[in-house]
Regions:
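Alpha-helical transmembrane segments in multipass membrane proteins, preferentially the mid-helix core
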Residues: 24-31, 94-98, 157-178
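Membrane-proximal helix-loop-helix units in multi-pass membrane proteins
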Residues: 89-97, 102-161
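Transmembrane helix-loop junctions in multipass membrane proteins, especially transporters and channels
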Residues: 36, 64-71, 103-109, 132-144, ...
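Short aromatic-rich membrane-water interface segments that cap or initiate transmembrane helices
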Residues: 4-10, 75-87, 144-157
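Hydrophobic transmembrane alpha-helical segments in integral membrane proteins
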Residues: 2-25, 152
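Hydrophobic alpha-helical transmembrane segments of multi-pass membrane proteins
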Residues: 14-97, 117-134, 186-201
C-alpha cells in the first residue's frame, strides 16, 4: 500500500486544473499563430503542452467521479487515472527529447537517444496497462469506486526524477564538450516540475504538478 497524506479540496482541484487548461490552450494558440511552419523541436514542445492539458482534464474527471456510483463510473475512474500516470511520464520523456534536440540540433541523434530514453516510459505504460486488469500494481479502485494508490506509483516518480536529472546532465555535459548554447535555463523547467511532483507524491489530493508544468512551459 502506498498512501501519503490525503488532502482533497475539489474547488482547489477545479481551479488549478482549469487554470492549467487555459494556460496550455493560450500557449498552443499563440505558438501556432506566430509560426508559419513548425520544426520538430516545436512539435515536441507543443506535445508536452498537449499532454499536460490532457493530464489536467483527466485528473479533474478522476476526482469528480471518485466515490460516485453510476453506470461506467468505475471504468471512467480507471481510465482517467491511467491517462494521468502515462501522461506524467510521457512529459518527462518528451522533455529529454526536446533538450537533446535543442542542444545538438541533430534529429538523427535524438532518435537514437530516444531508443534508450523510452525505456522508463515503456515500463510505466506496461504497468499501467496491467493495472487495468485489476492487478493493483499502480492503484486500486474499490467496489465503492474509491481510488487508492499502491506501491507501484513509485516507479513513475522515480522515472520522472531520472528524466529530469538526465536533462540537467545533458545541458552541463554539452557545455563541457564545448557546445555553444544560447540562454537555455533547463532548471527553470525542471525546478517547478520537480516541486509539483514531490508535493503531489506526499499529499494526495493536492493537484500541483500540472499547473506548475504549465507555468514552467510558459515562462
Amino acid at each position: 500500500m502506498m498512501e501519503g497524506i490525503t488532502i482533497i479540496v475539489l474547488e482547489e482541484i477545479l481551479m488549478a486544473n482549469g487554470l492549467t487548461v487555459l494556460m496550455m490552450w493560450f500557449l498552443l494558440f499563440c505558438r501556432r499563430k506566430n509560426r508559419e511552419s513548425l520544426h520538430v523541436g516545436d512539435k515536441i514542445y507543443d506535445g508536452i503542452a498537449i499532454v499536460n492539458l490532457v493530464g489536467a482534464l483527466s485528473e479533474t474527471i478522476a476526482f469528480l467521479v471518485d466515490g460516485k456510483q453510476f453506470t461506467g463510473s468505475r471504468q471512467i475512474n480507471y481510465i482517467s487515472n491511467s491517462i494521468c500516470f502515462i501522461g506524467t511520464v510521457s512529459m518527462g520523456m518528451l522533455w529529454c527529447m526536446y533538450v537533446e534536440l535543442r542542444i545538438y540540433r541533430n534529429y538523427k541523434r535524438m532518435v537514437q537517444k530516444a531508443g534508450v530514453e523510452i525505456f522508463p516510459w515503456l515500463v510505466e505504460v506496461i504497468m499501467v496497462l496491467c493495472n487495468l486488469f485489476g492487478t493493483g500494481i499502480m492503484f486500486k479502485i474499490s467496489g465503492e469506486n474509491v481510488y487508492q494508490r499502491t506501491a507501484g506509483v513509485l516507479v513513475g516518480y522515480i522515472s520522472l526524477v531520472i528524466y529530469f536529472a538526465y536533462s540537467i546532465y545533458l545541458v552541463y555535459h554539452s557545455k563541457k564538450q564545448g557546445v555553444n548554447l544560447n540562454f537555455f535555463p533547463v532548471i527553470y523547467f525542471v525546478g517547478p516540475c520537480f516541486a509539483g511532483v514531490v508535493l503531489q507524491f506526499l499529499f494526495y489530493g493536492i493537484t500541483s504538478s500540472w499547473v506548475l508544468v504549465a507555468v514552467a512551459l510558459i515562462f
